[in-house]
Regions:
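Nuclease catalytic cores
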Residues: 1-9, 13
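Nucleic-acid nuclease catalytic cores
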Residues: 2, 15, 19-130
């Protein structure tokens, strides 16, 4: 499954660039105030002065909504890069063959309450590691 996602991600990223003007990214970013808070969004752009991100997924199952674990990843990336919105893009496949002509997309808005929880958990973990 991971190999399929790695193979499809550049293709989907090109689609995201063409449709949504978000550039593909493989860069590793750190939060302004905490160099150990890291994120690797799949796409980064500045639209009208605001940072926007993209996160690309492939799945063998239909989604009624974005899985919570992916939402946490998105909120974390928004925190690290100071973004307010992320375009979550996913391609469903059946036996590794895409089921639709185009990927599905949903915008996820920044949620500072969720980000606060995630930052607290990360800081606790880093504190334990520094002991």
């Amino acid at each position: 499954f991971t190999d399929h996602g790695r193979a499809r991600e550049p293709e989907i990223a090109r689609w995201v660039r063409a449709r949504h003007r978000i550039e593909p990214s493989t860069a590793l970013y750190h939060a302004h105030s905490e160099p150990y808070h890291l994120a690797t969004p799949d796409g980064v752009a500045v639209h009208n002065g605001a940072v926007v991100l993209a996160e690309i997924k492939t799945t063998g199952h239909a989604w009624r909504s974005i899985p919570r674990s992916y939402l946490r990843q998105v909120w974390w990336q928004q925190y690290v890069l100071g973004a307010d919105r992320t375009l979550v893009v996913w391609e469903q496949h059946d036996d590794f063959i895409p089921t639709n002509a185009e990927p599905e997309v949903r915008w996820v808005e920044r949620d500072d309450n969720e980000i606060h929880v995630l930052v607290g958990l990360a800081n606790r973990l880093l504190g334990l590691m520094r002991r």
